[in-house]
Every structure is written in structure tokens, then in C-alpha cells.
A protein has these predicted regions:
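Juxtamembrane interface at the cytosolic side of transmembrane helices
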Residues: 194-219, 267
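Soluble non-transmembrane domains of integral membrane proteins
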Residues: 20-181
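Bacterial N-terminal signal peptides
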Residues: 5-16
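First transmembrane helix
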Residues: 165, 174-204, 302-323
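Primarily the dimerization/phosphotransfer
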Residues: 393-414
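Carboxylate/His-rich catalytic cores and anion/metal-binding grooves
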Residues: 102-109, 211-213, 218, 222-225
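Interfacial "cap-and-anchor" motif at the non-cytosolic start of specific transmembrane alpha-helices
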Residues: 222-263, 267-397
Length: 414
């Protein structure tokens, strides 16, 4: 038994040593995730100074042991620590990338081997022009001398404490961004192609369903731009709007989705009570949106995420119900919302600190939205064909009835 205890203690010490090992930088072109090399300290009251954190024993820091940090939504301030080991003989220039654009306030402290400490700060509370590097995420330029440099990051935010942190040299960073830009270009290109196609159909057919598809698609685009940090870049000086825009868009997303669903599924014509329930739900969502004037921002943000998730689940159940009642294009609607609900569930759980399948971030939402919008557009086309067939069958039945009446009239006349 004593031997087993010693083995377990040795394994724990080895794991701790591995978790807090320095980030080794031994090539002039590198992009390295710092999550596995980071540890963190919670500051519940937010009153610890830099000196307090530097003097804190290592045992009080917890190892991240993941590719990135996700501590969910909370009211604490967090300190993250990592040691950067430049094995090269010369200074290594690059960026510290924190690729999550919804963080409120970041303070970065770098202590070089000669003991000097430099400070930088950023966050969505600052105007875009005040960022150390004017990109959509939070990047900090670093010059790492040969040897060990110690990095501390202070995070104070009302959003999810999510930090995908990388050290990247200039060339490696440009290469990674080029690949990401290709994916983003494909997503936004598809999105606006679907929006303009359905806008053309709305202008041609004057059908309200297409209008609400366009409204829903535009809201998706704005939400994606906000989640990506592009909205901050387009509106660089509106710092007050930056802090609340994503929550406003989450609520308007649910409103647009509910209104589109009412028109797509013809709930008013087929199931008036269900339609009344959807309208009541929209009034509740509107009230929750306006409650942001009274509630704490962090509570309101969590409420927005839960509202989106619960509304998506409710709309999925509406689609299943309509499909089972014989509305044929309800199958497309159900498939679309099944995919999107899965994406929303993953992201909402991630925003609360529980990562499902190890996924969180804009990519999950974009993939779900892409499949959903394409499926709904196909469903709209199928819906048109069904309505045309129903109209043709109605006209044919009317013509046959008219012919029968004429024949009956001639028979009676004779």
C-alpha cells in the first residue's frame, strides 16, 4: 500500500510538472497553442495586483491541460500564467493571439529574462483603434529575447471566459489567417447568396415567407460577424454597442426564427392555437430583450443564450408536430432545425463552461447555420411546388365540377 501511494504521488508530480512545463520555441517560424502550458488563478473579488500574483505560490495555480481555456460565465477575474522558452540565440518576434473577440478587458504583462516588465491591454471595452494590433481578435506584439520569459494575462469579462491562446511568428500567423479567411469567405458568400436569392423571390412573388427568410438570414450574418469580431471592426468607435450587440442579436434571432416559422409552416391557417402560442412566445422574447435595461449584463447574456436554445428546441418540436400532421415540407423544416439545435446546444453549453464533443466557437455555429439555411431554401422550393400542385389540383377539380354542372344542365334542358 505505501508503494502504491508513492507511485500515485509520483504520477501527480509528473503530471503537474508536465502541465506547467514551459512553451518551447526553437524554430524561427512557429505557431504554438499555449493552453497545455498555461495555469490559472481565480481572483473572485478582482483586487489582486500584479505583485500579488507574482508572489502567489505555484501550488495555488491550476493547470489548464487543454488546448484552450474555457471557464464559462462567472463574475471572477482570472489570471493566466505561462512561461515562454526561446531556445534560439536571437530575439524571436511574433504575436500573442487571443482569438475570442468578446472578452471585455485584457491586461498582458511580459517579464523578460533581464527582469524588465512590459504591459499591454485590449478588449471590447476599447475602441478598435486603441488595440495594439488592429485585427478582429485580440493580438499583442511580442519580442521574446533568448531564454525564459514569463507571461501573465489578466482577464475581466462578462462574457464566457474562453481563451484560445497562441504564440505565432509573423509568417505562421499569416498562413493560419489565410486558411481561416478562405473558410469565412465561403460562409459569408453562401449566406449572402441565399439572402439575395430569396430577396429576389420575395420581390417577384410578394410572399411574406421569403421576406422573413431574408430577415432571418441577415440576422444570422450580423450574429456571425459579431461572434467573429468583424462587427467591431466595421463599427470601430461604438464601444458601448460592442458589449451588448451579441445579446441583442441573439434575441432578435429568436424573434426572426419564430416569425419565419409561422409563415413557412402556415400555422395561422392550419393550427390557429399553435400560431397563437408562437405569437405569445414572441411577446415573451421581446419582453426579455427589453429586460436588458434593468438586468445585470452577465445575467442578461446568460438569459439570451438560454432563450435561443429553448426557442430552437420549441421550434423543432413545432416542426415535428406539423410534419406528423401531414404538412409535407415540415420534413425540411425539422431537419434544418435539428442541425441548428445541435449546433446551438454545443455552443450554449460551451458558453456556460461545459464543452460537448470538445467543440465551441464560431465554426460550430457557422457549420450549423450553413446546413440549416440551405435546407430551408430547398424546403421553400419544395413548398412552392406543393402549393402549385395543390392549386393545379384545385383548378382541375373546379373545371371538372363545372363540366359536370354543364352536362347536368344540358340533360335537364332536354
Amino acid at each position: 500500500m505505501p508503494r502504491m501511494s508513492l507511485v500515485l504521488l509520483w504520477l501527480c508530480l509528473c503530471n503537474s510538472a508536465w502541465a506547467l512545463s514551459s512553451a518551447r520555441l526553437d524554430t524561427p517560424d512557429v505557431r504554438l497553442s499555449l493552453g497545455p502550458h498555461m495555469s490559472y488563478l481565480e481572483d473572485p473579488r478582482g483586487n489582486l495586483s500584479l505583485q500579488d500574483v507574482q508572489n502567489t505560490p505555484s501550488e495555488r495555480f491550476q493547470a489548464v491541460n487543454h488546448d484552450h481555456v474555457n471557464l464559462g460565465k462567472n463574475t471572477s477575474v482570472w489570471w493566466f500564467r505561462v512561461e515562454l522558452d526561446n531556445r534560439l540565440a536571437e530575439t524571436l518576434p511574433g504575436f500573442l493571439e487571443i482569438n475570442y473577440p468578446l472578452l471585455d478587458h485584457l491586461q498582458l504583462y511580459l517579464q523578460t529574462p533581464d527582469g524588465r516588465v512590459s504591459q499591454q491591454e485590449s478588449g471590447d471595452r476599447f475602441a478598435f483603434t486603441q488595440r495594439p494590433v488592429q485585427v478582429r481578435n485580440f493580438w499583442f506584439p511580442l519580442q521574446l529575447p533568448s531564454g525564459n520569459s514569463h507571461l501573465l494575462i489578466r482577464v475581466d469579462t462578462t462574457s464566457t471566459v474562453f481563451l484560445p491562446v497562441f504564440f505565432s511568428t509573423y509568417g505562421a500567423s499569416a498562413q493560419a489567417q489565410e486558411n481561416l479567411m478562405a473558410w469565412n469567405g465561403a460562409f459569408y458568400g453562401m449566406l449572402f447568396a441565399m439572402v439575395f436569392y430569396n430577396l429576389f423571390l420575395f420581390l417577384s412573388l410578394r410572399e411574406a415567407t421569403y421576406f422573413w427568410y431574408v430577415a432571418y438570414g441577415l440576422n444570422v450574418g450580423l450574429l456571425g460577424a459579431c461572434f467573429d469580431g468583424m462587427l467591431f471592426k466595421l463599427l470601430p468607435d461604438y464601444t458601448a454597442l460592442q458589449g451588448v450587440s451579441i445579446y441583442i442579436l441573439l434575441f432578435t434571432q429568436t424573434l426572426a426564427a419564430a416569425q419565419f416559422s409561422r409563415h413557412f409552416l402556415h400555422t395561422k391557417d392550419f393550427f390557429p392555437r399553435l400560431d397563437a402560442g408562437l405569437r405569445l412566445a414572441m411577446l415573451v422574447i421581446l419582453a426579455l430583450l427589453l429586460s436588458g435595461l434593468l438586468l445585470d449584463l452577465q445575467l442578461w447574456g446568460a438569459l439570451a443564450s438560454l432563450t435561443l436554445l429553448s426557442t430552437s428546441l420549441a421550434l423543432l418540436l413545432v416542426g415535428v408536430f406539423m410534419w406528423r400532421q401531414g404538412v409535407r415540407y415540415g420534413s425540411y423544416y425539422t431537419l434544418a432545425w435539428s442541425v441548428l439545435l445541435t449546433a446551438f446546444a454545443i455552443v450554449t453549453a460551451g458558453s456556460l463552461g461545459f464543452e460537448l464533443l470538445g467543440l465551441y466557437g464560431a465554426t460550430t455555429i457557422k457549420l450549423g447555420v450553413t446546413i440549416e439555411l440551405i435546407t430551408l431554401s430547398i424546403g421553400l422550393a419544395n413548398r412552392i411546388n406543393i402549393l402549385k400542385d395543390e392549386g393545379f389540383n384545385s383548378r382541375r377539380a373546379a373545371e371538372q365540377a363545372n363540366l359536370a354542372n354543364q352536362a347536368k344542365g344540358r340533360f335537364l334542358a332536354t
